Amino acid sequence: MVEFSHTKKIGSAGRFGSRYGRKIRVRLRDVEIKQKKEYKCPVCAFPKLKRVGTSIWVCDKCGAKIAGGAYTPETGAGKVVTKAIRRVIESKSREI
């Protein structure tokens, strides 16, 4: 017997069938795609950073544990802060 899947458009959120409404299932699909995507480790640059729990990410190669966002290793706010810190460090190195 062949299993039939109703997940062509909605992806993994198809497991909920017609429950909860389309918008919520689409949002869930987008979050799950981000969450399961392969990310690079900031320590060793190996592309196998995996989510262990909420905001906890572990590299398969070097074993580095990183605290990040709930669904992605680096949040939008974290990127902004990192850029600001880099600018400050660069401006101080230019002064010297």
Swiss-Prot record:
Co-factor binding details: Binds 1 zinc ion per subunit.
Keyword annotations from UniProtKB, A to Z: Metal-binding, Ribonucleoprotein, Ribosomal protein, RNA-binding, Zinc, Zinc-finger
First and last residues of each zinc finger (C4-type): 41-62
TM ranges: none
Listed GO MF terms: large ribosomal subunit rRNA binding; structural constituent of ribosome; zinc ion binding
Cofactor(s) the protein needs: Zn(2+)
GO terms classed as biological process: translation
Pfam families: Ribosomal_L37ae (PF01780)
Annotated GO CC locations: ribonucleoprotein complex; ribosome
PANTHER family: 60S RIBOSOMAL PROTEIN L37A, LARGE RIBOSOMAL SUBUNIT PROTEIN EL43
NCBIfam families: eL43_euk_arch (TIGR00280), PRK03976.1 (NF003058)
Sequence similarity: Belongs to the eukaryotic ribosomal protein eL43 family.
Record-given protein name: Large ribosomal subunit protein eL43
